[in-house]
A protein has these predicted regions:
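A sensor for short, sequence-defined functional sites
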Residues: 1-310
Length: 310
């Protein structure tokens, strides 16, 4: 009951998103509802679709020749971004004046999870510096869900528990509640690095050094559906005292899937008193078919091996 949902300000998914569509139409925008099947519900049949294939309704609006998909049920989803459960490749657009039609539902832009670390090794062996973490779109939504309920002290404690010998001196964030902007977090840190036979060791890939391969099976019968494309860049810079030198750094190299469907690159630069390492891991399409599974799994395997190189 749409009227009741509007009056009571409470409703199910269909009532809320139909109300949203009606509101958009009332403002003279080109809007219509789209029936979809959520990820857990499976794909609807394209050839002979039936109502029982669908279990969810979203809204579609066209503004200045650009199409946006909307869902008003999740307060942490920004304009034009659907909840992850709705990313199931396609849906059925319903125009009550014209025949219904299939429409692709694939996010345009990659979700980013980037990290910048500017560090300095002190004469006493302690490393100090700052880390900036930036997330966008679905990566930002996931991070907001993680940190919104927590105090700054709890966020610091969780960060320190994930990394051996790291102490967080201060923490702050930007745009936590402004969901249309990237979420930016700042950590000021110190690292009790420890001296092992006169050597200091530091993994420049930070949280990615704990990454594990999500693909365990030898073969796969069904597609791998990430839902969205993604990009992860880490830029690491370490300044050294004059009496220190870099013995080794990650080797510059590149890995890539066919048609650039996914890739990993790492580049290292060593100057007189400074080492810089930049790595980028990208998944450039959201859906991989079963015949692409082996190469996708191998990309993850080789990337993780580099992340974990001593």
């Amino acid at each position: 009951n749409i009227k009741e949902a509007v009056s009571e300000k409470v409703g199910n998914v269909s009532e809320i998103n139909i109300s949203l569509t009606n509101a958009l139409i009332a403002t003279k925008l080109n809007a219509e509802i789209v029936m979809i099947s959520t990820r857990e519900n499976g794909f609807p049949t394209r050839l002979y679709p039936v109502m029982s294939d669908f279990n969810y309704i979203i809204s579609k609006v066209k503004i200045n020749d650009k199409t946006y998909f909307l869902d008003a049920t999740d307060k942490l989803v920004s304009f034009g971004i659907l909840p992850f459960r709705c990313l199931n490749s396609y849906g059925r657009a319903i125009d009550f004046q014209n025949p219904s039609d299939w429409i692709d539902i694939i996010p345009e832009n990659p979700s980013k999870n980037d990290l910048l670390g500017i560090l300095k090794l002190q004469e006493n062996g302690i490393i100090t510096g700052k880390i900036k973490k930036l997330t966008t779109l679905y990566e930002a939504k996931e991070r907001r869900e993680e940190v919104t309920p927590l105090s700054n002290d709890a966020i610091i404690s969780k960060f320190e528990n994930n990394f051996k010998n790291i102490k967080v001196i201060s923490y702050k964030n930007e745009n936590l509640k402004d969901i249309d902007k990237p979420l930016i977090e700042y950590f000021e840190i110190s690292i009790e690095n420890g001296d092992i036979n006169g050597m200091h060791y530091l993994n420049p890939f930070f949280e990615n050094s704990k990454m594990s391969n999500p693909f365990k099976q030898e073969d796969r019968l069904y597609p791998v559906d990430f839902g969205y494309t993604q990009s992860n860049t880490i830029l690491f810079s370490l300044e050294l005292p004059p009496n220190f030198k870099v013995v080794s750094a990650p080797e510059s190299q590149s890995l890539s899937l066919e048609q650039n469907a996914g890739n990993f690159t790492v580049k290292s630069a060593i100057e007189s008193f400074k080492v810089t390492v930049k790595s980028t891991f990208t998944i450039n399409k959201s859906l991989f078919y079963n015949n692409e599974y082996a190469s996708l799994k191998e990309l993850y395997k080789q990337t993780i091996a580099i992340y974990n190189t001593p």
